[in-house]
Amino acid sequence: VEGSENEKAIDITSLRGSTGYITLDPGYGNTGSCNSSITFIDGEKGILRYRGYPIEDLVKQGVSFTDVSYLLLYGELEESQKKTDFKEYIRTHANIHEDMNRYFNGFTLSAHPMANLSSMVTALSGFNPDGDSQDPDVIDENIAKLIAKVKTIAAYSYRKSHGMPFIYPDHNLNYVENFLYMMFGEPQKDYIQNDVVSDALNTLLVLHADHEQNCSTSTVRMAGSSHANLFATISAGIAALWGPKHGGANQAVIEMLEGIYKDGGDYKKYIDLAKDKQSEFRLMGFGHRVYKNYDPRAAVIKDKAKQVLDSLKIDDPLLDIARNLEEIALKDEYFVSRKLYPNVDFYSGIIYRAMGIPTNMFTVMFALGRLPGWLAHWREMVLDGQRINRPRHIFTGNTKRSL
């Protein structure tokens, strides 16, 4: 079979039935689990497109996160009554049930914000008993409901972990502004929006909105294939994202940069350590499972990082260290020959840090951005009528034994 971008695959749907063989592909690096029209990636050329639109163009034109969400879900950017209704629903349904607000009291201050997020998204299923409906209209409403409410849950997860009172959503604000207001607003005080910060956060959310069949998206498809409740299915995706090999990479970058700074800022020393086979040090934020070229998202974020720091008048030495590491690595044969280029995580943590978002919230921010991608893939799977996912394994245990 051949995709619309000339990607070639071997259809093995009937392999076991006709030959008795199955394929073995640990990690699924050579396996296409489905057909999809949502996101195209060419890792060799550094291409990422949502529904045909290059990610760089979406950012350059300032397309909003809610518009990109609609694009991923329904395939179009053009204005329509359906799109207007979608955005209005998201704007006016950001509040969560008051009983859910009280659920937060069950979490300790030390609870990880991802624990709060995952649990509270699952709890939404208790307030939405039609979460397992296959009716297209109900599906679309539940999708908009999740996009509207997860940002509120994310902001409340942050405030809970800091012992701060919740700030209720303001329906007069756009998606990103409302999130920042709920995160950093104070009771009885006006919250002053910073347009550069809002724009940078919108960019980060857009860049993270989808990335084809990654671990968490595949988890959503896997759980959703059983027709599990949508809210619980998204919670499964959040759990998969929580893993440090998936959603925690930008936190690891910040911790690495902080370590280099505390050690005197000698970035050349750490370049040498990264190349030393005897060293356990790994240069975080370089290389990607898919991209064998410069991650197109990283190029965009690099510029946004400087804009945010300049706007907030922050002189962050970590940005200088990051730039120096990148400059050397892009010219060093060791990294070039191994196709180790900066990825999206290399600069995103610096932006979050400048905004005042703590490192334990970085993965929550990733989840907030990835939500429309999860929902788009779930919707596509349900409407395509894909059967329940059921991989097999090659048994390598004991043969039959006697008691």
Report each predicted region and the residues it spans.
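Non-transmembrane, aqueous-exposed alpha-helical and coiled segments at domain scale
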Residues: 1-403
